[in-house]
Amino acid sequence: MISTNQFRNGSAIRVDGKRFTILSFQHVKPGKGHAFVRTRLRNMDTGAVIERTFRAGEKVESIRTDSRPMSFLYRDGDLYYFMDQETYEQVAIPEDVVGEAKDFITPNGEVSVLYADGEVVSVQPPAHVELEVVETDPGVRGDTATGGSKPATLETGLVVQVPLFVSVGDRVRVDTRTREYQTRV
């Protein structure tokens, strides 16, 4: 059990029998009445984001989480297979648990797999990944009236806006949190 005064972003808690990750929290002390903590929580099982208010000092159950580095091996149907880099065990993770991270996973690519209560709850790619451009329109010299960017399909199927000078075969760095082009590598 932890007090609402001990909340930290990324902490895992159990509320009403459901597992949540704390996305953000704010302690509020109104002029009248008791202090409270306003939070944004992500359900670990469904991915839904909710807002919840707790009384200051209220106790909630904390969940032990463990993050393990893993390498992506292959995909078979809707299962993604990863290898734990410490124990060399293979772990099969369903596509719905992998979620949006699938857009950034390449063969032998490293990810962080989050376990809660001994079960996989999420797959998190690194903050930046380098992916190859497999399809994009050729950039026409002097064509900057459209803002200087064009859509490009990357090797994982992700489509991002890239500058006109990027062509098929180039490798680009993408920010996995914003899903935006960063630079050509």
From Swiss-Prot:
<keyword id="KW-0648">Protein biosynthesis</keyword>
<comment type="function">
    <text>Involved in peptide bond synthesis. Stimulates efficient translation and peptide-bond synthesis on native or reconstituted 70S ribosomes in vitro. Probably functions indirectly by altering the affinity of the ribosome for aminoacyl-tRNA, thus increasing their reactivity as acceptors for peptidyl transferase.</text>
</comment>
<dbReference type="Pfam" id="PF01132">
    <property type="entry name" value="EFP"/>
</dbReference>
<keyword id="KW-0963">Cytoplasm</keyword>
<comment type="pathway">
    <text>Protein biosynthesis; polypeptide chain elongation.</text>
</comment>
<dbReference type="InterPro" id="IPR001059">
    <property type="entry name" value="Transl_elong_P/YeiP_cen"/>
</dbReference>
<dbReference type="InterPro" id="IPR013852">
    <property type="entry name" value="Transl_elong_P/YeiP_CS"/>
</dbReference>
<dbReference type="InterPro" id="IPR012340">
    <property type="entry name" value="NA-bd_OB-fold"/>
</dbReference>
<dbReference type="InterPro" id="IPR015365">
    <property type="entry name" value="Elong-fact-P_C"/>
</dbReference>
<dbReference type="GO" id="GO:0005737">
    <property type="term" value="C:cytoplasm"/>
</dbReference>
<dbReference type="InterPro" id="IPR014722">
    <property type="entry name" value="Rib_uL2_dom2"/>
</dbReference>
<dbReference type="GO" id="GO:0003746">
    <property type="term" value="F:translation elongation factor activity"/>
</dbReference>
<dbReference type="InterPro" id="IPR013185">
    <property type="entry name" value="Transl_elong_KOW-like"/>
</dbReference>
<dbReference type="Pfam" id="PF08207">
    <property type="entry name" value="EFP_N"/>
</dbReference>
<dbReference type="Pfam" id="PF09285">
    <property type="entry name" value="Elong-fact-P_C"/>
</dbReference>
<dbReference type="InterPro" id="IPR008991">
    <property type="entry name" value="Translation_prot_SH3-like_sf"/>
</dbReference>
<keyword id="KW-0251">Elongation factor</keyword>
<protein>
    <recommendedName>
        <fullName>Elongation factor P</fullName>
    </recommendedName>
</protein>
<comment type="similarity">
    <text>Belongs to the elongation factor P family.</text>
</comment>
<dbReference type="GO" id="GO:0043043">
    <property type="term" value="P:peptide biosynthetic process"/>
</dbReference>
<dbReference type="InterPro" id="IPR011768">
    <property type="entry name" value="Transl_elongation_fac_P"/>
</dbReference>
<dbReference type="InterPro" id="IPR020599">
    <property type="entry name" value="Transl_elong_fac_P/YeiP"/>
</dbReference>
